[in-house]
From Swiss-Prot:
Compartments, record wording: Cell membrane
Keyword Repeat tagged: no
Listed GO CC annotations: extracellular region; plasma membrane
Protein source organism: Tropheryma whipplei (strain TW08/27) (Whipple's bacillus)
Pfam families: UPF0182
Leader sequence residues: none
InterPro entries associated with the record: UPF0182
UniProt protein name: UPF0182 protein TW644
Similarity annotation: Belongs to the UPF0182 family.
Amino acid sequence: MNIKLRFPRSSLAIAILSVVAFLVLIALTAFFLVHFYSEYLWYDQLGFTGVIVTQWAAIFVVFCLAFVFVSIFLWLCMFSAHKFRPRYTSLSSVLSHYQKVIDPIRKIVVLLVSLGLGAVAGIFAASRWDIVLAWLNKVPTGKSDPIFHNDISFYFFDLPFYRRLLFFLLVTFVLGGILSILISVVYGALRVDGKEIWLSKGARVQYAVLAAGIFVLLGLEFWLNRFDTLLSDRSGLITGAAYVEVNALIPGFAVLALVALGVALLFCITAFTSRWRLPIIGVALAVVSALVVITALPWGVQRFHVDPNARVLESEYIKRNIESTRFAYGIDKTHEVLYSAKTDVKPGQLRNDARTTASIRILDPGLVSRAFGQLQQFRQYYTFGDDLSVDRYHLGGETRDAVVALRELSLSGLGSGNTWVNQALVYTHGYGLVAAYGNDRTPDGEPKFFESGIPTTGLLGKYEPRIYFGRKSPPYSIVGAPSGAAPFEFDYPSSSGGESYTTFKGSGGPKLDSFLKRLIYAMKFGSEQILLSSQVGDYSQILYDRDPIKRVGKVAPWLRLDRNPYPSVVDGRIVWIVDGYTTSDQFPYSDLNSFTTLSQDSQSLPALVNGSDSINYIRNSVKATVDAYSGQVKLYAWDPNDPILKVWEKVFPGTLHPIKEISGDLMSHVRYPLELFNIQRQILARYHVTDPGVFFSHEDAWGIPIDPQKSEPVMQSTGQRRSRTVFSVAQPPYYLTMRMPGQNLAAYSIYSVFIPKSTGENSRSVLTGYLSANSDAGNIPGQISPDYGKLTLLRLSKDQTVPGPGQIQNAFDSDPKVGNQLNILRQGGQTRVLPGNLLTLPVGGGFLYVQPVYVQSTGSTSYTLLQKVLAAFGNKIAFESTLNQALDSLFAGNSGASNSGTSDISIHPPPHSDLIAQIKAALREKVDALTNKDLVKYAQADSKLNELLSRYLDANRG
């Protein structure tokens, strides 16, 4: 007997939709569980559980408050609109039809609409949990604004919170009004009959109360607008309240606030009198008042009173802007020195600057990456960054500038061996720091390394060389092995066809000590192998989120991070040093700018900032370190007096370490942040002027010279309010150990130059100023050098004409002798000539320019070699094989400088130097064969090179 079950089509559709909805619900639940649990495990392992729990708690509480308030408010609006409907009234056929359709499901629709809009409101409110926490934990700054005399903390913490709260309430009231009108129309409480509008009594009361609430909120909005004038750039002249704002807009906004409150009162009266004429007149009056106060009055005052006397009337407000901007950007204590620069040359002119000239960095970190790769990569699964870092080390009794890089892991180099086992379990880390003298080279033009090789040898002593956490680390690795088991993580190549293995020891990531955790991470990374692999067990740890910037950003979400972390060997370990900034766009009278635009130079990484990119206050409040082996993150309160830092210390107690815990070794590697210096030099280009009259006329505005090596604009994205593209070719600043004029000792500092800000035919690339920031924090544990961070500005006399970087580069490019030698270096197109960084140095009573010149063959495996040095002083230039020769050529055969470009440190000769020579020869044979497209010789040279490298590694290992 066959029994056939038949389901109505509607029931089948409901069943299918129910199953789909259930599956979607399960998937969403699983997604959130995986995300939240894995995040908790990550923070817990690092010891920052309080950070994520506080975030989640704040998000949850803010969401719930907003959700409950909006849901109840909107439900009450719709419920009241229905409750106050007329009981007996004739409706049109259309409205009657709508009532019949809606009535059966009215309650559920009202509930769903209320809950849905409440959820949206909750998400909106919770997205800025940071504003709420900052407001709840605010601290005074001790500094007040010049108009209202409010503490600056009011603008940092109170005003953003009040602004967002008002916007939230205003939108809620407007939504409540719209929904109430819809219900009233459907149920006849609001009818339009020809020219007449009819309202039921209940609807009249409800609309009047809602309108009164809206105008109360608008009144508060106008009142807050008074304070916003101190933060706006409406005048087009400065950020902050200028003459028109102080004398017209601020009083006008106060009047508008009173008008709005008066209109609200009229609506309240209407709720009881049913007379709409007065509130309608009030609304019209409010609109006219707003047009007059916001548009007509400021225009009239500006046009007929300010413009004819602008220089005098705006002087007071320009002065406030100058003082506030210089303080907010940390340039108010810049030490200015009038520098009378010489342009003539004479023998022995650099004798008093011998220490500086001996330290001139001729190694360009932006050009030697390929040389580091070809000479120190050793295997295809290692890599170096494109732009290397500049650091300094104490070697042989003195501090030497160095170009450094980490030999990081590159999974793309595995080729066909790029399996899951190799990706996740075997190739887990890079190996070793490579460092070369900044002021030296080999006779062949290669970097002169003082720390290199595998295993690492050199002058830095013994340290942990393995790099599990870096800029190029794999998305995730699983490390660890059972006690006594043979290690299976690849460590480094050790012999011909052989490899050395290791096992990670320590705590670097969440433990996979349960089936649930392995399931969670299998789902997170979309890899079932995490569950199935026999090499993953209770002993395993999973390492992920390994980029030092990302790690610091997660444990300190309130920080803005510098995009230029750099590695250093500190206390026997490799650590990444990351600079963190506290910023705000709420400092009264301070110039408002885009962080991304100000911090860009021709070598900056592209940055797309989510949310507001605006700033008018910045402090380098935190120095962070990330251990390259364990991934441990430490945050140090570098500027404990910063009020924003104090707030976040209250929000996340116990996450910041005091300065006293910084070791002497770490202190010696701390430097002045690159992006902060970029921002400050851009601000100082305009705000070196402190006289309001000169500032108003723009007669002494400066600019940053373009990078002479960049012929094409570098396109970058900004995130200020709306994403846009900017073009940045600003010459990058440079780190160097040098003695500035007027100083007794040389100091590791960062430098940049200024030229006049002009465009078109009137542009002049002559020097107007030279800026330095002391980057030497000293080496005393827990104590910052008093000179660290000191800004020094050499201001040139206006009657002097000293060539700027652009003019010097043009002189280099157009000099016939230099051109002839460059043509020889190009070898008929077989090699490329690459100019290095153009350094400007205030020595010899003037300015010395130095530029290394590199050559690179056209082969794919070629790398840059430093072959020549260009130098210039005044209008004289030299082009020689060494810096010393170039300086002597400039200064009539005797510069008086020491042996620049050579090292007097006793360096242990590399073991088996004959092998090194053979390796270099084989490498050149390989490059030449590839250039000539001789595949047979290329294969032979490659085989020979691998054999020699294996012998060298064996010799070092032994």
